[in-house]
């Protein structure tokens, strides 16, 4: 690092490009809001992408995009570059000689992308004396950076973003470079109540990770102020504090909440709108969890947890306008059905037939409504569909 001072900002799993969860629960929040903010500091910022070697080895998939984590790293690099942001390097975390990680490293280097490796540390994260030593973080590659603001992001959770930040702080400090660390994530919103629908919606979104929102006891003790954080940050804070003390001599933070730079709670102008949007999101997540369970991608615990969150928010599935019409259409037709709410509030449904699935029928019916086309008009002639059905 050529500068006398650098800052590491740890980004959460939330996306810079398409944070649709935030846009759903905070009406008016653009999916790329964080990217726009970052672009204002583009000349000072450097992107570092972390990926876990184990995720490369097992071809872990981002289900929202249908691509593996290593493919997503390549996508992120191109996305950032297309936006005019500088991607400095990729760090492969928890490396222990995995062949898949070696192949990926070679692929990146052939594209002139710098690659660093961080290794497994025995007893991590509780063995602080070993972690903060030449045999712990000291074994990791020192990541050469050239700009004062380093943003560490990743394809998804468990990629090692926080550990990468702490390792880098250790190495910078050893080189006499003053470096800081902050957490850049939107949820949970620390200055909203624990059971506020926006924060409950975050729990629903992370039901598969078993995240739980809780009062930050360290912040309450230090400042006498009630704030909200999630269990993983609260549980790990004593360890982080000890690591910071090992690096700096003293910790700059008195609580997990202190580590964040989230000001979203101060931007809410219509709390009622956010509450309603968040309740709708919890219901949506409930059905998403049921779908994952049916496809054997999720667990019943995930469904039970979101159902409990619905009880906490005092809501049920009937509060989502498309549910009742969809169930009624399925009951009447005797097969799978689908429903959609248009921008003007109109509910459109579609049923399963010998020619079309429910989703295809729904889309065609929605086009008819939007185009004011009589329902008995065929947008696609049955004779055009039948050969496809025969082929299938």
Model-derived features with residue positions:
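Flexible phosphate-sensing "switch/lid" loops adjacent to ATP/NTP-binding sites
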Residues: 1-153, 168-327, 342-344
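The conserved Walker
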Residues: 156-157
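Hydrophobic positions on the alpha1 helix immediately C-terminal to the Walker A/P-loop
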Residues: 164
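Amphipathic alpha-helical regulatory segments at dimerization interfaces
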Residues: 328-329, 369
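Short, small/polar residue-rich loop motifs at catalytic or cofactor-binding pockets
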Residues: 332-336
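Cytosolic beta-strand hydrophobic patch enriched in CBS
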Residues: 337-341
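Zn2+-dependent cytidine deaminase-like catalytic core
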Residues: 349-392
